[in-house]
Amino acid sequence: MAMASSPACHFRHPPRLRLLLPLSTSAPHPWLYSWSHPRQRGRLRAPPAALDLRPEPSPSSDSDDEDAVGASRSSGRSTMSLILSRLRRAGYSGEDPRAAAPPHPPRGSVEDVFRADDGVLPNARGGFDADDEERALGDARFPWERPMPPPEAAPRSARSPTWMAELTLPAAELRRLRHAAIRIKSRTKVGGAGVTREIVEKIKEKWKTEEVVRVKVSGTPALNMRLFHEILERKTGGLVIWRSGTSVSLYRGVDYDEPEPTKKSKKNSQSLAMDFPIKGSSNPSLLPTETANSVRDSNVALVSNAAKEELVVQAPEIKYEDEIDKLLDELGPRYTDWPGSDPLPVDADLLPANMPGYKPPFRVLPYGVRPSLSRRDTTNLRRLARGLPPHFALGRSRQLQGLANAMVKLWEKSSIAKIALKRGVQLTTSERMAEDIKKLTGGVMLSRNNEFIVFYRGKDFLSSELAEVLLERERLAKSLQDEEEARRKAASYFSSAETYAQPTVAGTLGETLEANSKYGTKHDENHADKMARTIEAARHADLVRKLEWKLSLAQKKMEKAERVLGKVETALRPTEDSRPPETITDEERFMFRKLGLRMKAFLLLGRRGVFDGTIENMHLHWKYRELVKILVKAKSFADVKRIALSLEAESGGILVSVDKVSKGYAIVVFRGKNYRRPSSLRPRNLLSKRKALARSIELQRHQALSRHFAKLNRKVERLKAELVQMEDVKEQGDEELYAKLDAAYSSDDEDMEDEDDEAYLKRFDNEVAGATADDDGSDDYTSAADEADYPDSDDEAGDCSEDEGEDDEDEAAAGVSDAGFHGEVVGFSSDTDRRNHDVNEY
């Protein structure tokens, strides 16, 4: 029967309700007990009994099945647990399963260290502490079993924007007010100035006829709606019941019609102690002694608590607010539209723009005091100013003498002056404001942003009384000095000067000429010429030393360039292939040359020369055509010839021709009759694009330094020869030689030459930096990609001025028919010397 009824039970009983029914009365494991009841605190009320949907058991069924499987529908407890509870109430208490367990060793004993409970892990020392269970499990209840925290205790980010309204108003009333706010069509618009006095008056005017006012925010206040929420409630005294985006619904409150209670200061402890017994009884002496003592003790306790709260918490705040209010009232009118908290700042725009006779305050730095602020002091002052309310609200950028005068008065009682910038004011610049205030007051600006400007009065600031005393002392000292000077002038005016019978000649030109004629060195008529020759020789020797120093410097730079070039060329390993090259006939060469020059597709070879990308693009061209045309801009035909032989050796093709075209030189290479595409298109023995550019730059640097070194060397040799010539004509002199030296070696020319040399060397450094940035581009070797690799015509003209003669000869050689070069190529193709020549040329 039990087996027969179980399917029906399982079918009709929902799984969720079955899990909620207790199936056993045995005590749970200790760790499970700890999980459900951590430290026996925070225990929740037992859940209500689940609905039993099972059928009524038949009389013939075994009662043990109900006890083992089911529970009582009335209480939700198992039948066995009910029987046991009745037996315990009747006095028949059986053995408790917890008491039947062996007793635990006493706490603190040696055996207690080795005790291990279920669900409790040992600590770092291998033992178990009394609080390990609590620390390990903590609040082990499930999230739905834990009590919900109040809205005010929730994190600020998790709170509802209207949590205060949800706490103070009933849900039905809050729902009604929100529906009423949705039906309101008119909205009060708040601009960039924030919650001003006009906005507050407009809201209160609407509250006379409506309970809820809708507010639409725009401008700067919309950037921080949480702050606007707080300011709106504080200014108007209402309650925000709904907020979404920049729209706010403001409720006037339940007791809006009632007059607002005036703020009264709390009673003193003595008044509380005197008034309380009078309220309790008209005659305290008629009370019993015990009652009077108890009343007196309760009064004393109440008074002490109230006094403590008033003194500890609220007294400093009230004192600060009162003092700052009095101080700001003395400085000027308040800015009533201030959106922040009290106290209201002084409206600096209502202060006088110009004050006649205003001067910056007199300042004197005490002896031994550092004038500037340290970093720590500056940080502390900024942190202090961050929490202070602003003292002034400023909206204009000029005519700030009235504000400066008020700041000086404020500095007598406060070391920091904080200025708030009005929002929504056009044509204002905080930087100009800060500069003008600093000039007028002499203070130190601590911080400046779009909202506040903070000034420190400075270490040399003096109060008005002390400054007046010091100025009086200074005026007194100045008057004494003026009196002494006047008396000294009067005494010198009345003094009689003795007159000499004969005027003296001391210090006159006659005395100097007479002394030179008696004691001076006599020079002959050629003395000036000798001095000029000596000066010229010294100048010439100095020029030689200077050029020798430049020569040594250039030699060091050239050695450095050679080292760098050698380091760059370590990865360059030219091909040394001993295979016999393929040959083509003269007719084939003629046809290939003609077809290659007519090809529209070509490759550009720039300043990088032959590198792995060049060979890769040649193989890519050979995939669809047999010929490849390469355009090269080189300085000489010898360079073009070297490049052509290098391309032939590295690619494995056959060099057809090298021709002079309008864009430079055209190199035509045939892929060969037995061409096979290699597995790796980029050869590993050549440089990469980046390294090829670095090698090109270092080669150009080395060539420029070589020319510079040769030029300096020739100049030094010529100067040394001229020095020898000057020694030969030292006695008789040579005016023509001196005139030639003056014209050739002037100091101005040397200075210009030095500047040219420095600019020449700096230009190469800039090219290196630009080339490094250029390497980040793509490796495509197309015509558009490598046009920038060619050197400019101006740079070529500047770099190759010494080799113009050689270039002319090369151009002349290239202008002749290329038959000689073609014949040389054909001659190379007849034997194995061609490959050796390629290696040597490379």
Swiss-Prot record:
Transmembrane segments: none annotated. Residues 703-732 form a coiled coil. Residues 167-263, 371-468, 582-682 form the CRM domain. Residues 49-80, 141-160, 254-290, 768-842 are annotated as: Disordered. GO terms for molecular function: mRNA binding. InterPro entries: CRS1/CFM2/CFM3 (IPR045278), RNA-binding_CRM (IPR001890), YhbY-like_sf (IPR035920). The keyword Chloroplast applies. It comes from the Eukaryota. The keyword Coiled coil applies. Residues 280-290 have a biased composition (Polar residues). One of its GO terms (biological process) is Group II intron splicing. PROSITE patterns: CRM (PS51295). It holds the Pfam family CRS1_YhbY. Residues 831-842 have a biased composition (Basic and acidic residues). Its main location: plastid. GO terms for cellular component: chloroplast; chloroplast stroma; mitochondrion; ribonucleoprotein complex. Residues 1-82 form a transit peptide. It is found in: Plastid, Chloroplast stroma; Mitochondrion. Residues 786-812 have a biased composition (Acidic residues). Keywords: Chloroplast, Coiled coil, Mitochondrion, mRNA processing, mRNA splicing, Plastid, Repeat, Ribonucleoprotein, RNA-binding, Transit peptide. Binds specific group II introns in chloroplasts and facilitates their splicing. Acts on subgroup IIB introns. The substrates of the subgroup IIB also require the CRM domain proteins CAF1 or CAF2, with a simultaneous binding of CFM3 and CAF1 or CAF2. May influence the biogenesis of the mitochondrial small ribosomal subunit. Interacts with RNA. Part of large ribonucleo-protein particles that contain CAF1 and/or CAF2, and RNC1. This is CRM-domain containing factor CFM3, chloroplastic/mitochondrial. It comes from Zea mays.
